[in-house]
Amino acid sequence: MVNWKIGVLIGALATAAFTLLPFSNAGLIAATPQQSYASNVQLHAKRSSVDFVPDGDSSKLAWKQAKWAEFDNDASGNSHFPEILTRVASVWTETQIYFFFWCRYDSLNVYQGEDPKAERWQLWDRDVVEVFLNPLPERMNHYYEFEVAPNNQWIDLEIDKAKEPFNDASWNSGFAHATRIDAKNHIWTAEMRIPISSMNVSAIHPGAEWRTNFFRAAGNGGDDRRKFLAWSIIPEGKTFHVPARFGLLRLVK
């Protein structure tokens, strides 16, 4: 896979290269900045009365009461893959925001024999779920990326598309995460807890509206053989990094 996080192509190569890249988080070229949001999909994140430690178990009361979204379409919205149907939910407290992914799978493609405690560069080249999160939507091109793999490997990045390279792997959110694999039923789950202070947010209040998109990469081989799903579709691009297509995350009571 082309390693988009090393840098950004320059000058005249940029436009041409953008059209040739596979549809994945690993798109090398940032999309042209847009001034308004073009997606009307939304998810309600309900308030949790307590904070909790992620363990990958959806039986918690918070997740039973949560609003769930599901998607099986590729990032362009043109194809559907029910065999890797993905569900996602979010809840929040005054200091944390949580996400839970429930994922069908055929087979798993992960890095073998590595320490899941260490941040894993190029995690997007294996099976992964991803949250792109913008708590300050008026700042469209500055947001945060969180990835977790079935074996609980992870990476987090600060994205600023005004910079080259636009991704900062040195940023560390301190987010907690856990996964479970149900091999019998071919389901894997991932649970994330993100401190809002890591994103320069001092508090969450009911009624807040953030912008987000959820992604999943699955399958073996090169990008031409893998599947790349998106909650809010991106019909105009070849990269996940099109913040104008982020959906709406409503933080409600």
Locations of regions flagged by a protein language model:
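Bacterial N-terminal signal peptides
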Residues: I10-N25
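Bacterial N-terminal signal peptides that target proteins for export
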Residues: M1-L13
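Structural preference for beta-rich elements and adjacent junctions enriched in aromatics
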Residues: N25-K253
